[in-house]
């Protein structure tokens, strides 16, 4: 008999796949919540049965989005603690409590990290700054909102972020706080870089050498910022650092459906020898980045390895908690 997985786990997994749940931080908090719901609603009669369910739920969630490392790092946070409890002979209710408590702890820490990044990053924003941003990052928005709330006169240039228009979400959110916003097409980034003082963007994953994997278009903005000698600041929680890259693993870049770029009905009329490629992310080399703002402080890109060793060194010693 297979593991009994609650409906909410499948629903959250599907929402992550379809990008109804989007953004690395929100994805991470959602998978932690999914494990918590599995533990809360499970009808397992033994710790062994619950542990089997948790592993199966984690596998379902793990397969949804390959690039955003926040997802497996959230799973690791909860499942590693659950595995320690299970391996130590915890009874059913103790194991259930461990999962629920660990998930709540992760979600709380994640939300606090965004606040802290805002406080730290705002110190680098000056009165009168024009800031450019790309896609939709809660951490990056926290930096800009905190600076604005401190009374700094700022204006934000928001790129549309094709093909899914996440820039619209960012523009509306910033405007709702009272921040003046200029909304531009992605290809206008270089044109408006000459009036930009700082670039503040988020990250989906950060590698051991300090490279940043983020929404497609990020690297072009960072490149043109370097050309114009404009500071590039990446705002990212430490759970977005990618532990496997310490062992040489490359980050898989997710390829999404061509119909996100060209509507399906139109695409059917196109010549068959035209391929539409739709990578969701690109890689920005560390030399295009000035600083990474984390909840632990501001670091240069080359110090990413230190964060990884401190936060995830333990993860390299074991198989994934849901694999054995």
UniProtKB/Swiss-Prot annotation:
Catalytic residues (UniProt): 135, 204
Positions contributing to substrate binding: 22-25, 65, 137-139, 214-215, 240
Enzymatic reactions: alpha-D-ribose 1,5-bisphosphate = D-ribulose 1,5-bisphosphate
InterPro entries: IF-2B-related (IPR000649), IF_2B-like_C (IPR042529), Initiation_fac_2B_a/b/d (IPR011559), M1Pi_N (IPR027363), NagB/RpiA_transferase-like (IPR037171), R15Pi (IPR005250)
Domain of life assignment: Archaea
Signal peptide start and end residues: none
Keyword Isomerase among UniProt keywords: yes
The protein's Enzyme Commission number: 5.3.1.29
GO biological process: L-methionine salvage from methylthioadenosine; pentose catabolic process
NCBIfam families in UniProt: eIF-2B_rel, ribulose_e2b2
Family: Belongs to the eIF-2B alpha/beta/delta subunits family. R15P isomerase subfamily.
Reported function: Catalyzes the isomerization of ribose 1,5-bisphosphate (R15P) to ribulose 1,5-bisphosphate (RuBP), the CO(2) acceptor and substrate for RubisCO. Functions in an archaeal AMP degradation pathway, together with AMP phosphorylase and RubisCO.
Record's protein name: Ribose 1,5-bisphosphate isomerase
């Amino acid at each position: 008999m297979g593991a009994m997985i609650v409906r909410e786990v499948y629903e959250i997994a599907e929402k992550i796949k379809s990008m109804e749940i989007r953004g690395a931080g929100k994805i991470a908090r959602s998978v932690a919540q999914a494990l918590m719901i599995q533990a809360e609603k499970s009808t397992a009669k033994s710790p062994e049965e619950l542990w089997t369910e948790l592993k199966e739920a984690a596998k379902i969630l793990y397969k949804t989005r390959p690039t955003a490392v926040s997802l497996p790092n959230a799973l690791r946070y909860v499942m590693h603690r659950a595995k320690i409890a299970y391996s130590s002979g915890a009874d059913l209710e103790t194991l259930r409590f461990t999962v629920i408590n660990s998930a709540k702890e992760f979600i709380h820490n994640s939300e606090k990290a965004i606040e802290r990044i805002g406080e730290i990053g705002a110190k680098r924003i000056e009165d009168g700054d024009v800031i450019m941003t790309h896609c939709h990052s809660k951490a990056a928005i926290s930096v800009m909102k905190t600076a604005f709330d401190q009374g700094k006169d700022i204006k934000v240039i928001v790129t549309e972020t094709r093909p899914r228009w996440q820039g619209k979400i960012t523009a509306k959110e910033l405007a709702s706080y009272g921040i003046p916003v200029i909304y531009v097409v992605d290809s206008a980034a270089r044109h408006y870089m000459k009036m930009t003082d700082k670039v503040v963007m988020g990250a989906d994953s950060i590698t051991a050498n300090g490279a940043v994997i983020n929404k497609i278009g990020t690297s072009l903005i960072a490149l043109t910022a370097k050309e114009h000698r404009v500071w590039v600041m990446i705002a990212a929680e430490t759970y977005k650092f990618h532990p496997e890259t310490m062992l040489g693993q490359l980050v898989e870049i997710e390829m999404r459906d061509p119909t996100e770029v060209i509507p399906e009905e139109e695409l059917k009329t196109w010549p068959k020898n035209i391929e539409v490629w739709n990578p969701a992310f690109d890689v920005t080399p560390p030399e295009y980045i000035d600083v990474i703002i984390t909840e632990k402080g501001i670091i240069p890109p080359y110090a990413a390895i230190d964060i990884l060793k401190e936060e995830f060194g333990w993860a390299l010693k074991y198989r994934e908690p849901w694999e054995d």
